[in-house]
């Protein structure tokens, strides 16, 4: 949703988004606009990523999470600097594989407590709503969405640090 609001802001400032050179999309006489397309492609990328992530099962979750968070961080920074929202749309593809990696790393070695930990972990999805609200507040404070994506970069870097350091399991951490 925040990608759409940023697209509206760019259009109003005289920098409309285009898709194959068109700044509007008319289907069945209805102007769907680029804004709807951005969201559709983000979630479409998410779906495609989930579908192809099974092919990466031979690659460790730690490696997958490291690579995807690094790429997502780079894309978010490029998007902020260039004001090109297509880079943010591409992050949807990367985010799709992150969820399963984080989940796998979080429950590894929990033994009989895996189901309880899974429930706690699933409830943490609420954080996505909280960070969206924080980003909206930052957009109000800054008067623009452009630099609010720093919050996304910070979150990506936190996930990167989890992949590199926080997901390590020491023998004494394993619960029997």
Model region roles, listed by residue range:
Residues 1-39:
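Extracytoplasmic gate region of multi-pass secondary transporters
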Residues 48-61, 139-140:
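Helix-to-loop junctions at the C-terminal end of transmembrane segments
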Residues 96-114:
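Intracellular juxtamembrane helix-capping segments at the cytosolic ends
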Residues 134-156:
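A membrane-interface helix-boundary motif in multi-pass transporters
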Residues 40-47, 125-127:
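Short hydrophobic/small-residue motifs within alpha-helical transmembrane segments
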Residues 63-78:
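Structural signature of the two symmetry-related core transmembrane helices
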Residues 150-176:
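Multi-pass alpha-helical transporter architecture, strongest
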Residues 84-96:
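Helical-face signature of the major facilitator-like transporter fold
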């Amino acid at each position: 949703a925040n990608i759409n609001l940023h697209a509206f802001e760019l259009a109003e400032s005289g920098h409309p988004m285009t898709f194959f050179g068109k700044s509007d999309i008319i289907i069945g006489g209805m102007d769907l606009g680029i804004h709807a397309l951005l969201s559709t492609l983000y979630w479409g990328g998410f779906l495609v990523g989930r579908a192809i992530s099974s092919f990466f099962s031979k690659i460790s979750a730690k490696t997958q999470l490291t690579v995807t968070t690094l790429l997502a961080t780079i894309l978010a920074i490029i998007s902020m600097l260039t004001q090109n929202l297509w880079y943010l749309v591409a992050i949807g593809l990367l985010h799709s594989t992150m969820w399963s990696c984080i989940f796998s790393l979080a429950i590894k070695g929990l033994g009989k407590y895996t189901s309880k930990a899974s429930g706690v972990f699933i409830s943490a999805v609420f954080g996505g709503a909280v960070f969206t609200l924080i980003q909206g507040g930052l957009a109000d404070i800054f008067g623009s969405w452009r630099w609010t994506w720093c919050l996304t970069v910070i979150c990506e870097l936190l996930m990167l640090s989890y992949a590199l350091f926080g997901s390590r399991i020491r023998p004494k951490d394993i619960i029997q």
